[in-house]
Regions:
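Short hydrophobic-aromatic micro-motifs
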Residues: 52, 426-428
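Short, loop-centered acidic/histidine patches that primarily coordinate divalent metals
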Residues: 421-423, 431-434
């Protein structure tokens, strides 16, 4: 028996040594948290414990393009609004605009104003959702705070309960505008080819005007929170401008005739990494500029600029990879269309060294500026006397064939493209959503953040959260209706050996407690 003990001890020590050697080979973050949908990150380490590759993966498959086939085109605004419970208004509006093009009909001025009013309310409340519930907790509470605190409750703990009450009340009021005009907030039934389903009365316009005034004050307050919590903290500013969160890419966004951002309508503008205009095109021409690349490890297609071609996951002026979302929209714009947003726009670029800004985390700042613009635009539309004009529909008479619509979703440029037969039955549907436009840049951002944060195999939950911050800045939406309270979703990090065997597991439970297994 005594002769076996040294052998057993040697075996145990050898096994521990082997486990230590393999412990730093692969890190899996599954699920990633505080986003719309599901996703995971696989990080592969080299023998020195440094990051070799990192993959941002979307392991869910959605088939809306396929099962749109055979459906009446007029159903698409309702069908596509089911893609996501967080941004149904974006899909509803893109589909409605595609129907305008499909039936070759222009909505009356009042209908256009009602659509944009609803969309401005939606953009304001959605940007507030991201700042206070999803992305903001990383800064307001802190990137290395316990996971169970990085949520709206943690934010309230820092900024005060009265702020939480104000956020919830403001979002409720804005969503009431969507319900008033669109019938319901989650899956609105507002849009019709050539107009909208109902008018807005003078009495309703007066109510909307009150909410719009409150929204502007709320947006100014939110910008103040960002300044006091984020910009006043040198560590946060250093994190925003750090190389780990920087990529020089092309930028895309909708602009009006004066190259100012417009969420509802306009032309698509693209600037190169130096900020020079590369292209401006109509929605109908998007296939001349946008193409999709497929990788075997994700169900998301990776968009790139077609004339430049797919050059792999790299940035720079020769790469076709581009970004959309708030920062990209401000980069492509020459100015803002409203006064308060213009002041904030100038402040951001002056602080960050001029245009364009390529710091991924600056999306949070840009998003707050856009929140202010959306609120100001909401007020402009609420004050417009033409909003309550009863003429809200132009009946279509043309034979349908093909229609393309584009809007700026909160997360970036969104295209809907339908081809139908003469009866208006969908034969083909192509949806290019914001997260597809951003997918390649998100993948690069996650990998670069991982390489900048992980070295010598040193990993903590705080470090992994900073890696997650790289994708969270884009506010990606994976079109899934499953949601969990931010901070309560469990996190499992599994370290596997070269043969795929699990060597160690770090588990975060719903209460935020950590366990090594």
């Amino acid at each position: 028996m005594s002769s076996e003990m040294p052998t057993q001890e040697a075996w145990r020590r050898g096994a521990e040594g082997a486990q230590a050697a393999y412990t730093r080979r692969r890190i899996t973050i599954d699920p990633i948290t505080r986003l719309e949908g599901h996703g995971k990150i696989d990080i592969f380490l080299d023998d020195a414990g440094d990051v070799d590759r990192a993959y941002f993966q979307v392991p869910e498959l959605r088939g809306f393009e396929k099962f749109a086939q055979g459906r009446p085109a007029e159903d698409m605004p309702q069908i596509t609004s089911r893609i996501c419970g967080v941004c149904p208004t974006a899909h509803h509006m893109a589909a409605t605009k595609a129907l305008d093009a499909l039936y070759q009909v222009e909505p009356p001025p009042a209908a256009r104003r009602i659509r944009e009013l609803v969309y401005s309310a939606f953009m304001t409340e959605d940007h507030a959702l991201h700042f206070y519930f999803l992305g903001g907790p990383d800064f307001v509470v802190g990137p290395e705070a316990p996971a169970a605190q990085r949520n709206i409750l943690g934010v309230i703990g820092v900024v005060g309960q009265e702020v939480g009450v104000r956020v919830i009340a403001m979002r409720r009021r804005l969503r009431e505008i969507i319900t008033l005009a669109g019938g319901k907030v989650i899956h609105p039934v507002l849009g019709l080819p050539g107009g909208v389903a109902r008018r807005i009365t003078a009495e309703e316009q007066a109510q909307i005007r009150e909410t719009a005034d409150e929204a502007v004050e709320f947006a100014k307050f939110t910008l103040g929170v960002f300044r006091s919590v984020v910009l006043a903290n040198p560590a946060y500013v250093d994190l925003i401008v750090s190389d780990a969160f920087t990529h020089r890419t092309y930028c895309m966004g909708l602009v009006d005739g004066q190259n100012r951002p417009n969420f509802y309508d306009g032309q698509v503008r693209v600037v190169n990494p130096d900020g020079a205009e590369w292209a401006t095109f109509k929605a109908a021409d998007y296939l001349d500029y946008v193409a999709e690349h497929v990788e075997p490890w994700s169900y998301v297609k990776f968009c790139y600029l077609k004339p430049l071609g797919w050059q792999g996951f790299k940035d720079g002026i020769d790469s076709g990879i581009y970004s959309v979302a708030p920062l990209a929209r401000l980069n492509v714009a020459d100015s803002m269309a409203t006064p308060l947003a213009q002041e904030a726009y100038e402040e951001m670029f002056a602080t960050l060294g001029g245009k364009p800004v390529h710091h991924t985390l600056a999306n949070h700042w840009a998003r707050v500026i856009e929140l202010l613009y959306a609120a100001e635009r909401l007020k402009e539309l609420a004050d417009d006397p033409e909003l309550s004009d009863p003429n809200v529909r132009t009946l279509p008479t043309a034979t349908p064939r093909e229609g393309i619509g584009v809007v700026e979703a909160p997360r970036g440029t969104l295209f809907h493209h339908y081809v139908t037969d003469a009866r208006g039955i969908v034969e083909q549907a192509n949806l290019i959503v914001a997260t597809q436009n951003n997918a390649a840049r998100i993948a690069m951002s996650v990998e670069k953040a991982a390489k900048g944060m992980i070295s010598n195999g040193t990993v903590s939950e705080g470090i992994l959260n900073k890696v997650e911050m790289a994708f969270r800045a884009y506010d990606p939406c994976h079109a899934c209706a499953t949601h969990s309270l931010p901070g309560s979703m469990p996190l499992v990090v599994a370290v596997r050996g070269s043969g795929g065997e699990t060597l160690s597991v770090l588990r975060r439970d719903a209460d935020g407690s950590l366990h090594h297994e």
